[in-house]
């Protein structure tokens, strides 16, 4: 995992240990070699609000609002902002303005702006619009795959192979997603081995990073650990990310488990925007604000300014005429 920070180190005085970690047994402090699971020094946050966060909105969000949101997020220190999706407007009408959005944003040289491209037609349209990074979206659930992208898992992987091959010729990096990694709205529980199978294929195809998504937010720390343990037998931690929805309020615990297991890339959405148009009942992604609060509280570097992210969250919530889903923003604004 490279350089790491530790939640508890044996060099702490017992008084400090007792003050900061009163729930831990004295034995842990006494055993010099003992320490809690290690955490990354730095976590890369992939902001998915402009795409995954807005795609489920019932009312069409004006193009200029989407552009302004991305421009605000570009000033926060976020290294990656997923801008839009080059899917058919028949499937996701909210993303029909993808070309205008991608051409309208003020790109920062320090930020990458990937776009979702489900097939070769979407990839070609994205490149024509100026995309310099793309993402493909697969599923660990056969039923979800057919309902979401209208094909089987195997057929989707064949489509992605075309995209990755074309991207290599253009020198464009490709990120992969595996949805339903911890549960499916149609099939229920998903076997970890099935997640591993799809993640491995995406990695072998050439995806530099594979994001494992708890699409409907049913995962627990236990199921996250079980799933990751299996995936890590085939895909290195350095090539993995986690993407957690907060339907049951378990997103942050699940992310913490992933960090302890070596993952250092986390997807999040400003103001906790999101859901899934093909997964009824799924709530938004973990909010970027809440994730930052947890990471900074653990002493983990992100390079992201929490206050500026909150300002971007205020903007989009006002534009959508709704309250933020971020607990941090709620608490701060109420004080």
Curated annotation (Swiss-Prot):
A lipid is attached at residue 2 (N-myristoyl glycine). Non-mitochondrial 3-hydroxy-3-methylglutaryl-CoA lyase that catalyzes a cation-dependent cleavage of (S)-3-hydroxy-3-methylglutaryl-CoA into acetyl-CoA and acetoacetate, a key step in ketogenesis, the products of which support energy production in nonhepatic animal tissues. It is an enzyme of class 4 (lyase). This is 3-hydroxy-3-methylglutaryl-CoA lyase, cytoplasmic. CDD domains: DRE_TIM_HMGL (cd07938). The gene is hmgcll1. Its cofactor is a divalent metal cation. Its EC number is 4.1.3.4. Residues 43-310 form the Pyruvate carboxyltransferase domain. It comes from the Eukaryota. PROSITE patterns: PYR_CT. InterPro entries: Aldolase_TIM, HMGL, PYR_CT. A divalent metal cation binds at residues 52, 243, 245, 285. Pathway: Metabolic intermediate metabolism; (S)-3-hydroxy-3-methylglutaryl-CoA degradation; acetoacetate from (S)-3-hydroxy-3-methylglutaryl-CoA: step 1/1. Keywords: Acetylation, Cytoplasm, Endoplasmic reticulum, Lipid metabolism, Lipoprotein, Lyase, Membrane, Metal-binding, Myristate. Belongs to the HMG-CoA lyase family. The active site is at 276. It is found in: Cytoplasm, Cytosol; Endoplasmic reticulum membrane. The modification N6-acetyllysine is found at residue 58. One of its GO terms (biological process) is ketone body biosynthetic process. Substrate binds at residue 51. SUPFAM superfamilies: Aldolase (SSF51569). GO terms for molecular function: hydroxymethylglutaryl-CoA lyase activity; metal ion binding. One of its GO terms (cellular component) is endoplasmic reticulum membrane. Transmembrane segments: none annotated. Its main location: cytoplasm.
